Amino acid sequence: MNKVIQDGKSINVALIGYGFVGKTFHAPLIQSVPGLNLTLVSSRDAEKVNRDLPDVTVVATPEEAIHHPDIDLVVIASPNATHAPLATLALKAGKHVVVDKPFTLDMREARDLIALAEEKQTLLSVFHNRRWDSDYLGIKAVIEQGMIGNVKHFESHIDRFRPEVRVRWREQNVPGSGLWFDLGPHIIDQALQLFGLPQSVQGNIATLRQGAEINDWAHVVLNYPQHKVILHCSMLAAGGVQRFTVHGDSASVVKATIDRQESQLLAGIIPGSAHWGEDSDDLVVYDASGQPQTHRTPKGDQRQYYIQICDALNGKRSNPVPPVEALAVMAVLEAAVKSSDTGTTQTVSLTDSEREQLQ
């Protein structure tokens, strides 16, 4: 990326989409970061945006936001099928771009966007915000400090209890919908950050709820030479499931509950305010004799994604989520789907050059 914004200049941001993700995550996180100015929102519901963001201009179409001359950064938080076409439009307009996860619908779209961003010398990043979750940061610290020895079994769950199918695009049979494309990117990205690319992927993806049109359950195994990673998400888990369970060759660690930042944002808590990101659910490490010892869970802070985006645009640091890392997530997403469809073990379809960039 060669197009660096002059240090000290406020970065004007256009947010495309003001549904659940745009309203709950992107808007408040952007507004909490000094140096970022949420200038425009593209939404068909101007009244909703004006009620929440009275000082922000609302435009009816993404094209108006993308082509506005004052906009430096375009954040795409619209439905998954629109990610690639809108990001393409924004990159061609010379804008810096953040895309919500999943990056795109498939690897081809992702590679096309990466090539276009390189051609235009603009920043392209993907919103893998759960790198800054308290639960993940706590587990990461335990592993890196050697408290459980060498990891042999790593299990990551994001489970919910929503037995009733809701009328929303994520639960309809449309491109990019389903639970695996919704929650899979989070748990894949965290696993890849910890362990790198797997040797192979085994996926089992299903539709279990009565009346469901698209997958609402996924169980995926990432195979590594010395350990196994299990990624699981479900809409039919009322309780009794740990967020993380990790077994090493000298001890084990459990994190029971998920990071609280989403629930805080839904409650209207301002990012960075008192108690933001705090997690009262301790990590529990079990020693070789099975005795538990609690360890305080660190604070989460998803603001860090946009703080680091701001710094990257000012030339102070690198892109916090380079697009090749999001491409790797897409590769695992696709491998799991293909494995589930065919009943076979799959490898991750990345080129040697892409793999080298991930080292």
Where are the language model's segments positioned?
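N-terminal Rossmann-like dinucleotide-binding module
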Residues: M1-L53
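C-terminal helix-rich "cap/oligomerization" subdomain common to oxidoreductases
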Residues: M1-S10, L73-V75, Q308-Q359
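Active-site loop of classical SDR/Rossmann-like NAD(P)-dependent oxidoreductases
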Residues: V21, Q293-I307
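A short helix->loop->beta-strand "cap" motif at the edges of active sites that frequently abuts
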Residues: V56, A93-K95, K120-T122, Y224-H227
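Beta-loop-alpha module in the N-terminal Rossmann-like domain of NAD(P)-dependent dehydrogenases
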Residues: V56-A115
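Rossmann-fold dehydrogenase core element
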Residues: D112-N129, N150-F154
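Predominantly a Rossmann-like dinucleotide-binding segment in NAD(P)-dependent oxidoreductases
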Residues: R130-G211, H219, G343
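Contiguous beta-strand/loop segments that form the cofactor/metal-binding neighborhood of enzyme cores
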Residues: D189-P271, R303-N319, A336, D352-Q359
